[in-house]
């Protein structure tokens, strides 16, 4: 299906508000390095290599705004910017939105700074899906048996054919975003797709490759080092 919106702009919010708690590090995880560069720079460079006209907004934890500016400024284009985030993920997203003027036909992508391995072709597919469906997310399937537990014991087994693991970016078309912004938010949503679902809007799914890892723990950082060479072959 051809896009109805031919003059769209693409905006990318990269959420980099981590403090290193789950990583068990005094250094926020987005500043930890693999392959000789901080995670955040790997992610930023990935989006800068995407040959689309876009504006990138880096949303940083307020305590680390100067570090973010120092590390990232050399990799930002003139239209890009760095702003302080909020107290929650959703609050940070709203802060990022405040820096933008989004029209109905535009596309907004929201991405975790700790996911440096998204593929450019996935970004293209995601945008196509957003144009057609309004809201979309990357997600991946599992080949594992999926169970639910209660008090540390198996409670039930879930049908993995209908189980997807949410990834990012998640994205939304401007007209749908404008509608969501007029609605009450109770409870505070954890991400874009849960926000949309509370308003009765379902997100379409674009399958992501299995290495679209969110670096959260020390073991993930070790995996990222290993994945880095492999990822170059997937590009």
Curated annotation (Swiss-Prot):
GO terms for cellular component: cytosol. It catalyses: 2-C-methyl-D-erythritol 4-phosphate + CTP + H(+) = 4-CDP-2-C-methyl-D-erythritol + diphosphate. The keyword Transferase applies. It is an enzyme of class 2 (transferase). Pathway: Isoprenoid biosynthesis; isopentenyl diphosphate biosynthesis via DXP pathway; isopentenyl diphosphate from 1-deoxy-D-xylulose 5-phosphate: step 2/6. CDD domains: CDP-ME_synthetase (cd02516). Pfam families: IspD (PF01128). This is 2-C-methyl-D-erythritol 4-phosphate cytidylyltransferase. It comes from Leptospira borgpetersenii serovar Hardjo-bovis (strain JB197). The gene is ispD.
